[in-house]
Amino acid sequence: KFYMTTAIAYTSGKPHIGNTYEIVLADAIARYKRLEGYDVYFQTGTDEHGQKIQEKAEKAGITPKEYVDNVAGEVKRIWDLMNTSYDNFVRTTDADHEKQVQKIFKKLYDQGDIYKGSYEGLYCTPCESFWTESQLVDGKCPDCGREVKPAKEEAYFFKMSKYADRLIEHINTHPEFIQPVSRKNEMMNNFLLPGLQDLCVSRTCLLYTSDAADD
């Protein structure tokens, strides 16, 4: 068995050359592995939730679902035009996908890996990222250089900190786990060793999203 997946294209706009570059490389790997005799399952798809999508749909005068339907259709058309050999194209608005997300969320919540708290920070809408004051560059988003706005909301968090020591030990004892070495060093030095932060896994201020919990 050989399972592979691409990153899923974000549907706030039409696919770009980076998306195309990735799907071509992934397709080449999938085809090569099939020639080697592997039973390959190759998956790709689209990410269809987020504030940028909500805002662009409002600007276009259509519903968010209509907006992502158009973009996802264009992504799939281009992938098919290039004869990519994916086995499954997943949209995050698919009913089956949403059910699985809710199932996993509930399981993690019930076992104490997800908890409710509040998130406060400086929010960059184009990047859909929260930042602290110390992370800003000249008072702006360190990724895109745009303005950020103060934001605070009730949210659910995944206890990544709970697994930090386990991850560090596994990476140290399995040096091939993250490749290339530069990415392993980046993960260790920038995230794990300074203290892994819990991850915010919900947004309460969006109208167009997938319901993860009853509230």
Protein language model regions, located:
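Conserved small/polar residues in nucleotide/adenosyl-binding loops
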Residues: 208-213
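Disulfide-stabilized cysteine-rich extracellular repeat microdomains
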Residues: 146, 214-215
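N-terminal, positively charged nucleic-acid-binding surface of large information/translation enzymes
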Residues: 1-205
